[in-house]
């Protein structure tokens, strides 16, 4: 990951996702590689060039596996980045409980194309999964997907994701008006990344004075 540190209101980090050029260079250096595994989006909402990376990976005869744990919501609104599921990745793992209305521990594995042996995946899935799966969690996954599908089909009222994006857009506009807090622009608008002189101090103040729980501070 290329990181550039500039001076200003604290340290402002400009992060770029993984590029197709960096993947091509890595595969040229290691032509024996049979798979490429990347995380996109990052925890901070930085998205890599999945389409370009998929093209390079397949050109070298390898498969692309994307950890899209924090991007399960991408498919459900055009204001979010395009999901790796639609960008040519061969396998995509999504933790739907992170950004969608589902129980903790729920996740999905998407397999695309024919480069990955689906029967082999099922074989090892059966070996490593619990012999006593939680039907509550599985029902939660089903209910989550049904809810989102119905939400997208509702053309009359403002849907769940429409309202979510509306609130995100307004929040980001208001944050940009602040004098001592900078909003770091990232690919995923649902990630509110704030840049201040003392992140821990802001974390504690929002939690103790306003009851707002941030995910992390650095």
Where are these regions (language model features)?
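Hydrophobic alpha-helical scaffolding
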Residues: 16, 43, 70, 97-98, ...
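General beta-strand structural signal in soluble alpha/beta enzymes
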Residues: 37-38, 64-68, 91-95, 101-102, ...
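Structural signature of PLP-dependent enzymes
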Residues: 144-170
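Active-site PLP attachment segment
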Residues: 85-123, 129-140
């Amino acid at each position: 990951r290329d990181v550039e540190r500039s001076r200003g209101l604290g340290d402002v980090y400009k992060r770029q996702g993984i590029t197709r050029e960096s993947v091509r260079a890595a595969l040229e250096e290691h032509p024996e590689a049979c798979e490429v595994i990347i995380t996109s989006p990052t925890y901070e909402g930085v998205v890599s060039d999945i389409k370009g990376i998929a093209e390079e990976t397949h050109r070298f005869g390898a498969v692309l596996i994307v950890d899209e744990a924090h991007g399960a919501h991408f498919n459900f609104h055009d204001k979010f980045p395009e999901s790796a599921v639609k960008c040519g990745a061969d396998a995509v793992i999504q933790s739907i409980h992170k950004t969608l209305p589902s129980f903790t521990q729920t996740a999905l594995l998407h397999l695309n194309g024919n480069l990955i042996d689906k029967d082999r995946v099922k074989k090892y899935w059966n070996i490593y999964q619990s012999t006593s799966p939680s039907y509550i969690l599985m029902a939660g996954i089903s209910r989550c997907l049904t809810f989102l599908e119905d939400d997208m089909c509702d053309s009359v009222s403002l849907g769940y994701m429409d309202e979510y994006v509306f609130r995100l857009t307004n929040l980001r506009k208001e944050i940009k008006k602040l004098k001592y807090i900078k909003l770091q622009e990232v690919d995923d608008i649902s990630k509110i990344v704030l840049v201040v002189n003392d992140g821990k101090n802001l974390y504690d103040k929002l939690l103790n004075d306003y009851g707002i729980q941030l995910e992390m501070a650095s």
